[in-house]
Amino acid sequence: MADGRIIDAISDNDGHITQVTYTYVLAGVQYESSQALSDLQQARSHDYAPGKQIVIRYDPRRPANSIVV
């Protein structure tokens, strides 16, 4: 797991964030990825606003593959 930061978010008509773009750094390399949020994550959409810190899980063999946890 690693720390990341939300850099962009897409909201639905009700204002719930449904998709995020985030960045994280591993071994000096910066990665950027996007993910659709689960229903549970959407219920806490204030936690996924741009600028918020997040925790991501990544594949150690392919660190560009990650998910928001």
Residue ranges of model-derived segments:
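Oxidizing extracytosolic/periplasmic lumen-facing domains
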Residues: M1-V69
